[in-house]
């Protein structure tokens, strides 16, 4: 069995680790922006290179796609989405994204591209192929979102050993060396989601007692609050709205994120965006100051929203805030001073800040990978399901079978009956949530059990069994106890990716990887061509008069041909460019021979001159020495 990695697939940034060590990416950074872009030439960019070109390619630069993963286009959260790229409803109702040239991608595919990039970084570090991984998800992710994340891993060519909750992973990294039992809270405010988990840890046992959260609350919302403020202020000052200008919006978003980060350490920052737009009177510039106090007033409601899940989690455990031993902060947004203050006010103690909030989840995932593979021993992890799971019963009532905060894996059965006389089939609708009516909860999927013998209503006995595995993914079965007929399914909602779609995306990912390798070779060959042209032109300038006119002309023609070929952006021209490099290299050999001879002759002259000088110096020294001796003798 090969070594397994731990991956934190984040909304804003992602991170990969192995055996408690963070692996740097190709750019040498410890975290990778969760950004994927497609250029006009068809090149796919991931991470920092994708983020750098976002201003000029906003419609084809996809960020924060974790907020779309496992979601239907009609979900309420989609209304607040503030992104410059096209989001549309796929055939199955899922939220997908589209490039300006019409190419369609599922959020799982975009996640897979990021996972592939992290996988390659790990392989470069380890010097071997990596197949197995543990991937983290927000604790409050529902079944559809967990399944979509697992699909992303599969598309990326990874065997997903386990899907683990982010706060639980953070607790593993924090508490692995803690021997004495105590209760901790993990407050995880990331780029797109918020989770809070309460755990009891000690002697290698990590038991989650309760978890709560909001899968649509994070740093992106803080950025959007600043963006809205800047847009309003600019419109007041200049009378111009910028919402419909993608390039201006991207510049403002980047400036907002930068200002937010700066105000974690400074009391005031200046946002300066020259030439943001223009009107009949000329160019307009966005220039304004933002104080920490103003930022806090803009995002105060968002910070307050994190307190409600904290209260619910405490209520579910029956604990009070003063019974919490430690509060561990996770996620980049927990660097904000006002967030730290609010957590301190609520729990009545200074939060623990001894872990890196950007890296601790990936480290915990790597530890979990070690546990699954048997490399890390004497550690027991007991996680919970974040949401109640049940079925729709008569009158549209939601009947839970497994309550929220039940330790997983778990299995629960309950017997139901028919609602009408002589009913020969029942449809089982599976929901997840906390509302009383089924329609108000998330419909995970439905299936039918047919062939029930006709009987008065209430007589048939249909046993419905729910099974939640260690990944938090749901499996359901229904059995007619009279006939023994059984129907088993792994929940797959009306949305979600089918097996054939996943296989198609795996093939596309493999093809794209081959294309990326081809493009990499193309760039390397073009760089080689540029270098050869430069060195040859320099040599021609210095030594062109030393070769025959015919040879000089042939070399100049070969240089021009290579220059022209190098202008191509078609990766299929790589062999043609390589051929012209070989041709120029062979022709340049005569020029190289001339340079070598010239160099040898020059060295010979210097050596001869040096030898003559040495002899003369020796004679002079001898003469002087003799004179001195004579003088000494005459004394």
Curated annotation (Swiss-Prot):
Ranges of biased composition (kind: Low complexity): 597-612
Gene3D superfamilies, alphabetized: 1.20.1270.10, 3.30.420.40, Actin, Chain A, domain 4 (3.90.640.10), Substrate Binding Domain Of DNAk, Chain A, domain 1 (2.60.34.10)
Modified residues (Phosphothreonine): 193
Ranges where the record places region Disordered: 533-552, 595-635
Keyword Chaperone: yes
Biased composition (Basic and acidic residues): 535-552, 616-635
Record's keyword terms, sorted: ATP-binding, Chaperone, Nucleotide-binding, Phosphoprotein, Stress response
Alphabetical list of Pfam families matching this protein: HSP70 (PF00012)
Xref: InterPro entries: ATPase_NBD, Chaperone_DnaK, Heat_shock_70_CS, HSP70_C_sf, HSP70_peptide-bd_sf, Hsp_70_fam
Stimuli inducing this protein: By stress conditions e.g. heat shock.
GO molecular function, one term: unfolded protein binding
HAMAP family: DnaK (MF_00332)
Function: Acts as a chaperone.
Family as reported in the entry's similarity comment: Belongs to the heat shock protein 70 family.
Protein name: Chaperone protein DnaK
Origin species: Wolbachia sp. subsp. Brugia malayi (strain TRS)
Gene name per UniProt: dnaK
